[in-house]
Structures are given as structure tokens and as C-alpha cells.
């Protein structure tokens, strides 16, 4: 009977361990995707060490006197990524082209699933916030 209680206690202890389903560490390295939005095409993100490389297409309107056309251009940005903790990181452009590019981007992870995370991002110290979802590809 003594062994039965010991087994029961051990079983309860190990069966109540927290589930690692929402572990955010898997989002620190790898290839990710942000789906297309109104002005941007799909963004592909590659994270290695302290670098994040983003490739995306941007829609640009070109207007002449009588005609307005849209053109998609492919852009690649390289950013430094610094993790504050498992749910917050900041991004800084490696080669900023404008004053706005010099401001850091603060990202807060708000929800984690098996294959994605939702985030809220803020550029610099402004009140403007952008929300989105990042999907892990590999």
C-alpha cells in the first residue's frame, strides 16, 4: 500500500507539469512569414543570431499626367534584433536610409500558438502601434 501512494504522488507530480506548447523560444531563430496587407506583399523574415533579414514587396503608385499605375518593388532590409525577454524584442535598421529608419522598433509578443505569434509593434517612442501575426515557416 505504501508503494501505491508513492506511485500515486509521483504520477500526480509529473502529470501536472506545465505544457510547453506555447514556448516562445522557437521564434528566436528560423524563417518566418507575415501575410500580405494593403500596401505590402508577403514579408519573409530570416532570423540568425542577432540579425533579422526581411524581404518584402511594396506597392508604389506611379502617376503621369493622364495615367496612374501601380508597380511592385522588392525590398530587402537587414535589422539588428535584441531580445529583452521571451516576449519582447527591439529591432534597429543596420543601414538606415531615413530619420524614421534610425528609430528602434519595439515589439511585444501578445499571443503564442503552435505555428505563429501575434504582436504589437511601436516605432520609436511614438504612440503609433501596429498589430500583426508572424507565422513560422521553418
Descriptions of predicted regions:
Residues 1-4:
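Positively charged n-region of N-terminal signal peptides that target proteins for export
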Residues 43-46, 77-82, 104-111, 132-136:
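Hydrophobic/aromatic beta-strand elements that line small-molecule binding cavities or substrate pockets
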Residues 91-112:
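An anionic, turn-rich surface loop/hairpin at beta-sheet edges
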Amino acid at each position: 500500500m505504501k508503494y501505491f501512494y508513492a506511485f500515486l504522488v509521483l504520477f500526480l507530480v509529473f502529470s501536472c507539469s506545465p505544457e510547453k506548447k506555447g514556448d516562445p523560444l522557437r521564434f528566436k531563430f528560423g524563417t518566418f512569414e507575415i501575410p500580405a496587407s494593403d500596401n505590402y506583399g508577403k514579408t519573409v523574415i530570416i532570423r540568425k543570431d542577432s540579425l533579422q533579414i526581411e524581404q518584402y514587396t511594396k506597392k508604389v503608385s506611379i502617376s503621369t499626367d493622364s495615367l496612374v499605375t501601380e508597380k511592385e518593388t522588392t525590398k530587402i532590409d537587414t535589422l539588428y534584433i535584441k531580445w529583452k525577454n521571451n516576449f519582447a524584442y527591439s529591432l534597429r535598421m543596420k543601414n538606415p536610409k531615413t530619420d524614421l529608419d534610425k528609430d528602434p522598433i519595439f515589439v511585444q509578443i501578445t499571443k503564442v500558438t503552435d505555428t505563429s505569434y501575434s504582436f504589437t509593434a511601436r516605432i520609436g517612442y511614438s504612440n503609433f502601434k501596429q498589430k500583426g501575426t508572424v507565422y513560422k515557416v521553418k
